[in-house]
């Protein structure tokens, strides 16, 4: 049995085990308002699937959260390059990045509500949560660049495009990819949390809040499952697209590295 197949069996067995624990806990409690069974949660999700509002909420939240991620990724790359070029930029940004990392998400959300509308809140919060993660990742990648290759490139006066492809991108992209894997999960959690507090109409966070105040525990679990699934699917898709882009720019050998 190969390692991949063995790993899949282990994951399946672990999933079955925890579903069994969930089912046993639901039976022991015996109150749907506190804990529904896995079958009830899935049944509620199946009921939501045909509803147009369900898909509209997904589109509303996904669009804004991914916009925040995209803006954070772009800004982090630009700021990381600027910090590498100028020490004063690094000195200015270091306390800001540390502050963003250390401040609770809820504090940012409440403060941001003073300045932005509820519908834009998830964009801003996703952006803020992604920025320090990818900034650190890009800085790490830049720092790992081969200095001997950089010296050779300078001696032979290679154009910027060739330097990027030969030295900088092979160093930065692996760290950036790893950072994106972490940042995508963070931006979904923080983005939905912003919606739960800001309550923009037609969002996933609004649906979660409504399920909570109406004691619709089945819907609460169903929407939670949707958030987890969306986060996993978008992470897989984005990383697959990023890998293809890396392969196209660097070639198969560079992509594997």
Give the positions of each predicted feature.
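Transmembrane alpha-helices
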Residues: 124, 128, 161-193, 222
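Transmembrane-helix boundary motif in ABC transporter permease subunits
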Residues: 67-97, 110
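Short cytoplasmic-facing helical segments at TM-TM junctions of multi-pass membrane proteins
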Residues: 137-176, 208
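N-terminal signal-anchor transmembrane alpha helix
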Residues: 5-29
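Non-cytoplasmic
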Residues: 179-229
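Generic hydrophobic transmembrane alpha-helix motif, especially the helices
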Residues: 98-133, 140
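C-terminal transmembrane helix and the adjacent membrane-cytosol boundary/short C-terminal tail
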Residues: 87, 178, 222-257
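Periplasmic/extracellular loop-to-transmembrane helix junction in inner-membrane transport proteins
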Residues: 2, 28-70
